[in-house]
């Protein structure tokens, strides 16, 4: 076992604080509209320029192991806030640094760390309740655009694009961010349900120019097994041919005789047909087939449910206004399913998302939800250089997360004002003793820190003066760092999602509390290279090879 180095009490906390400060100081220069960029060296390729707090935090790795522990604890604040709310990572880091700094002063003065932490937790609980109280719901496209603009570092183009995307696919719709081929940033929307399976044979194509199959007002056969025998498929084919409408077949696979017969019928013009494999795998495939059935008003023909393919009738088939199939994707537009059934299915998937503990499962469930809700929007991000494109793409992803957070829990005044307004809730907090009261006061002071830092980053105004002026005013009145004027921030579009502000404070207090109650720190002792064992012998005589030259 490797030997360990241990530091205790004040010495340990001092080392941890150095690490906390190094990381926080690198991150907090990015805060607010006047925040600066941070340049990050990459082993391969050009350096990355970013104004995203969590990206900076993830790059910080310190040489001193004890300092590094402090830095990594605060990095956790940033990462967790990003995971939950998608934005507010810099605010969370600034709050964590302030709470730890103020807490350490009081620990050094003799306060009990455990009571300080209890006071901090009490205060945070009351401030969060007040934030929820002053929060207001997002009502329209304009407010969505404002949130997107702020989170994308005051880029109105990105804010407008996100608002447009949400308008097109709904608040539950899937919006993906991709790199564009050119310099323009644009929005494309895929209407209806799309899944990544193309036609099983190019002979199904109806438009040879576009190389896709277009089916108007088709019936849809949904089967959860392979189809290789034509005999079991024949009854439903005959019934569809009599109706004169096209047929779309979605099955685990179609092969051999069955596929050949479908192709022949299509080429002869007997039946307009197209076949694709079912999307997904395993249990997810079953769920997606059920989604398609509900969307189109059909039934999944499954022997598990007691249905057999040879007994299938027209009533088992789904219907849609149109289906387009290319070599990679199938898009079902305007499925004819019952609105109540689709609504119930959406509710069921939302319930699964809430219970899900896996990020991957949550992502897949959200994709299914969007496909049922009405489409997928793709934001194609363009830029002149790869460095700019990556930076812009990261900003768009942040803005998208923040906008979703705003839709979930509403918005509060931005610019650090909401935290200062929420501090009034601390007047009613009931700490049990003097040290807990000190913990409450630590939070009261820390809540001012984001505004101080936003002002400090402008480089032109004194933070203490601005904080006092904002504290002495009411409502949404605050300092707009972009124009360096005092105004109603919500009317000016300077807003933050409540979820982002709340999560930043909760995570900052949690990690700062752990650091304050730390009494010892343990790390591996670095091994010196001089202690390495000597190279094994046995290669003697190599010196004589000089004569071979």
From Swiss-Prot:
Sorted alphabetically, the keyword list is: ATP-binding, Chaperone, Cytoplasm, Isomerase, Nucleotide-binding
Q: InterPro entries in the record, alphabetically?
A: Chaperonin_Cpn60_CS, Cpn60/GroEL, Cpn60/GroEL/TCP-1, GroEL-like_apical_dom_sf, GROEL-like_equatorial_sf, TCP-1-like_intermed_sf
Subcellular location per UniProt equals: Cytoplasm
Signal peptide start-end? none
In alphabetical order, the GO MF annotations are:
ATP binding; ATP-dependent protein folding chaperone; isomerase activity; unfolded protein binding
| Gene Ontology BP terms | protein refolding
Name the positions where ATP binds.
30-33, 51, 87-91, 415, 496
Give the matching CDD domains.
GroEL
Catalytic activity line of the entry = ATP + H2O + a folded polypeptide = ADP + phosphate + an unfolded polypeptide
Location, primary (coarse class): cytoplasm
List the record's Gene Ontology CC terms alphabetically.
cytoplasm
Q: Main role?
A: Together with its co-chaperonin GroES, plays an essential role in assisting protein folding. The GroEL-GroES system forms a nano-cage that allows encapsulation of the non-native substrate proteins and provides a physical environment optimized to promote and accelerate protein folding.
UniProt record similarity statement: Belongs to the chaperonin (HSP60) family.
Subunit-level organization: Forms a cylinder of 14 subunits composed of two heptameric rings stacked back-to-back. Interacts with the co-chaperonin GroES.
Q: What is this protein called?
A: Chaperonin GroEL
Q: Which organism is it from?
A: Prosthecochloris aestuarii (strain DSM 271 / SK 413)
State the gene name recorded for this protein. groEL
